[in-house]
Amino acid sequence: MKPKLKAFPLILFFLCLQSITASSQERQTKTISYNNVKVDIVIDKPAGNELNVLMVFHGTVFTDNKIQEAANRTLENFKNILDNKEMMIVSVAYPEENLLMGDNVQQAEAALLWVKNKAATDLGITVKKIFLAGHSQGGYIVTRLNTMHPTDGVIANAPGPLNLVYRCQLEENAKVPASAACTLLRDKYGNTTASPAVYQERSLLNFTSGFKADILFVQGLEDAPIQLYSWPQFKQKILACTDCQKVQFLELKGFKHAALFNSPEAKTAFNQFINSRR
């Protein structure tokens, strides 16, 4: 019996320590509004009141009943690779269902402007630096936001869609399964032959200049052919940019769409990018 009695205080100590750690990390879902645009966000706040903020943006899920799950999962994915545990993470549950590609940038922008201008008052904190990070369509979102508002740095993993003309032509020719992005555009404007400009202006290839903050692009070179088809052109256009802040590319052989979360090299680059701007 004596060993068990001796072990009890130690077990109690670790349980108390666990409780203290959990209470120092607050997680809440909040509906915010900025300029009359509403969007849900998930906030993961560490202890302390002077905080750097990492805003993260999920990939495509198509239906809005999956948005909250995607926002929470994306928060966890980025939290797992983030070395600095003293950053507040804000995951933006931007909508998708029945919206044309890019129309949800307004909700993402509202979240960013809320963090910039209202989070301090609403949460009782001091916001220091603000970073944006996105995966897939979330990478599309943060790249576009980087042409609109200055931040302290942006990370985009496998951003897309890069080229809606190419992608939607494949769908029109039954080469790949139909997607909501192309179907919605076709229903409103006609196909890529009838209205190519509409598809071009919503493609990420159309947003390759005017970056207001340094940006790191991460791309797995075993990603889907649709992504890799336009990747060299996208990279070339950005490298030719004359009014962009510093741009970095990390291309990873042997990694697919989620390279940022699976590659040790990508994780290191992600943290170095953030830490060098603290």
Regions from the language model: what does each represent?
Residues 68, 159, 165-207:
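Mobile cap/lid helix-loop segments that gate and shape the active-site cleft of serine hydrolases
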Residues 113-136, 148:
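Gly/Ser-rich "nucleophile elbow"/oxyanion-hole loop immediately N-terminal to the catalytic nucleophile
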Residues 101, 232-278:
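C-terminal catalytic histidine-bearing segment of alpha/beta-hydrolase fold enzymes
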Residues 69, 213, 227-238:
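Short alpha-helix in the alpha/beta-hydrolase fold that links the catalytic acid
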Residues 211, 217-219:
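Short beta-strand/loop motif that positions the catalytic acidic residue
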Residues 50-51, 60-99:
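Short substrate-entry loop that stabilizes the transition state in hydrolases
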